[in-house]
């Protein structure tokens, strides 16, 4: 039972303890002490009527007791001890609305723009999702000491810079929500299409990102929050078909669509419709709408490429970037033929954009291959190979290279 409560409520308890104690490390210590007490007492005394409230209360009072002991040796801690004692009897600290808002406070604090992006991701996975330092390091192919240092520095920055533990004001909320969504999507993207390593995907990361997306949807019912969750669900729906049994990369057009998860597609498509109907949607919703068009096509040949190009046109105006241009060019190639797409990709590369982006060169190689321009295709595949760090992608590109005529 304690294990079940830990899985379901430990992050909520931690979020409230951070608010009450004002420090990440003290809150984590209090959380550990509270669950240690639960393991000792619940089998003997029975499970409390409200386990979460019991854990928060126990953790807080253990922290207060520890602080009182420290005051004997460090007088500078007396003010903190007095404040904690006074707050302990404040009913506003315990009302349900405050406790529910604590999860939002934690997310916004972990994703504060004053923190470096890699620290935002590491802190969010550690504090909001509860992953260990070793799990985060393994997911991002980084050493545990590196991840630990990022987390330590992020906590120090929050403490020393006086970053408030709060939900942003209404005026600041749109920009801050964008930062949170960006962090969640970074986590998902690394799980959906790993930037390096032996696997195409990392289910642990994409699963955590979807869990975060669902949590945000509960706490912050905004159209773009729904749009991001829809995008993640629709992309995740194809996971089983994205690699062969041998672990080889399978392109979208060659995937066995019977392996796609129809429940995730239905949920994602419904979220897209809800976000679009709000008229307040943004880039994540538009990307999700594109993913929904792919998901709803019964076969690759039945894909509505005209609709996809139209959606990319809207996305390019809402959130212009070279990557959006590249994806639009690939869709134009499917609608109007490879030469039309190649012309657009060459224009992007001629500007100097995406010169070190392996997918730009692999897309160019594929269009040259389809046009029978083997020498250009070979050079572009070779360039893409030099830039990719993911083993299945490397094997795919090597296979395509070997299939080109001499």
PLM ranges: what are they?
Residues 70, 78-118, 127-135, 142-313:
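Amphipathic helix-loop-helix modules that constitute alpha-helical solenoid scaffolds
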Residues 60-78:
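Arg/Lys-rich amphipathic alpha helix in sigma70-family domain 2
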Residues 15-16, 20, 30-41, 54-66, ...:
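Amphipathic alpha-helical interface segments
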Residues 1-15, 25, 174-182, 186:
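A short, charge-rich alpha-helical start-of-domain segment used by transcription regulators
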Residues 228, 232-235, 287, 291, ...:
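"A position-specific structural signal for the A-helix of alpha-solenoid helical repeats
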Residues 24-43, 49-56, 78, 129, ...:
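Conserved RNAP core-binding helix
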Residues 6-24, 37-41, 108, 112, ...:
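Amphipathic, Lys/Arg- and hydrophobic-enriched alpha-helical face
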